[in-house]
């Protein structure tokens, strides 16, 4: 069914108040957008930062009369009689179906394919990971995930123990197992990620080789031959001593979730534990690799 969309130009100080008022007026969905294309790359844990110029976007049922709502908004001192807004009708879409229609099998490196569960496998003789991302991040389409998958494909993982730090959908963990890893430990702060990783491991018949933990539950003596962490620069720096402790001497490391301009600083920081290689790049993103000293 169609929807009525109300867009209000405001600022970060007032956006939350407007959002609360619109929910009271019957809005079924509220989102915030950047009013002036100003990026926020990496909020601190627990923060939900907003842009200085923020657009509040509210959806209402198509039958909703917004006249009283707009009249109420005009009485707010921080908006005023002539506040900037736009009302339009938008058609509903089956967004899940649209996304599924555009997610096709993708090859990474020479052996590895990531195949959506609803698509036919292009090469049955290849190493195929059958993926249903569900609620967690990680389909292989993002440059950071692609960089990590290409790196895993380049390794000989036979009889290797692997850690996937920030496992998300489990795509890297499952790929490592399908590429021959002895076992993989996946760690994530999100229960949904743990569930999605488990489901994708079961779909690929490798669940018996995958152990999944929240950070506080991971074994204290956990060690691996290979560790991959596709998270963000801030957590990578904060977790560096723990990540280094988890990699065996001579073991291999891959870090991603980094913007190009962040890569050198993180590489320099990790060099106290690892012999770091030259960074690899894809679009605006980077991957760092190294060997444990």
From Swiss-Prot:
Gene Ontology BP annotations: methylation
SUPFAM superfamilies, per the entry: S-adenosyl-L-methionine-dependent methyltransferases
Catalysed reaction equations from the record: L-lysyl-[protein] + 3 S-adenosyl-L-methionine = N(6),N(6),N(6)-trimethyl-L-lysyl-[protein] + 3 S-adenosyl-L-homocysteine + 3 H(+)
Localisation: Cytoplasm
Organismal lineage: Bacteria, Pseudomonadati, Pseudomonadota, Gammaproteobacteria, Alteromonadales
GO MF term list: protein-lysine N-methyltransferase activity
Database matches in Pfam families: PrmA
Domain of life, per lineage: Bacteria
Protein name: Ribosomal protein L11 methyltransferase
Keyword Oxidoreductase annotated: no
Annotated family: Belongs to the methyltransferase superfamily. PrmA family.
Cellular component terms per the entry's GO annotation: cytosol
Keywords, ordered alphabetically: Cytoplasm, Methyltransferase, S-adenosyl-L-methionine, Transferase
Enzymatic class: transferase
């Amino acid at each position: 069914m169609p929807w009525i969309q109300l867009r209000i130009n405001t600022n970060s100080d007032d956006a939350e108040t407007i959002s609360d008022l619109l929910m009271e007026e019957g809005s079924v969905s509220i989102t915030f957008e950047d009013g002036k294309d100003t990026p926020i790359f990496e909020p601190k844990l627990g923060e939900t930062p907003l842009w200085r110029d923020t657009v509040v976007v509210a959806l209402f049922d198509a039958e909703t009369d917004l006249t009283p709502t707009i009249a109420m908004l005009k009485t707010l001192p921080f908006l005023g009689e002539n506040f900037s807004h736009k009302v339009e009708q938008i058609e509903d879409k089956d967004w899940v179906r649209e996304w599924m229609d555009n997610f096709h099998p993708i090859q990474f490196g020479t052996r590895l394919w990531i195949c959506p569960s609803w698509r036919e496998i292009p090469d049955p003789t290849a190493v195929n990971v059958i993926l249903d991302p569900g609620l967690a991040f990680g389909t292989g389409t993002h440059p950071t995930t692609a960089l990590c998958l290409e790196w895993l494909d380049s390794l000989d993982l036979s009889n290797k123990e692997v850690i996937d730090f920030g496992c998300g959908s489990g795509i890297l963990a499952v790929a490592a197992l399908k590429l021959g890893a002895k076992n993989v430990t996946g760690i994530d702060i999100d229960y949904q990620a743990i569930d999605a990783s488990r489901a994708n491991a079961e779909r690929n018949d490798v669940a018996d080789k995958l152990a999944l933990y929240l950070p506080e539950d991971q074994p204290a003596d956990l060690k691996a031959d290979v560790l991959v962490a596709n998270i963000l620069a801030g957590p990578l720096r904060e977790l560096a001593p723990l990540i280094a402790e988890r990699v065996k001497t001579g073991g291999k490391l891959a870090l991603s979730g980094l913007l190009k301009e962040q890569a050198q600083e993180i590489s320099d920081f990790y060099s106290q534990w690892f012999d770091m290689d030259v960074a690899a790049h894809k679009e605006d993103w980077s991957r760092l690799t190294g060997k444990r000293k």
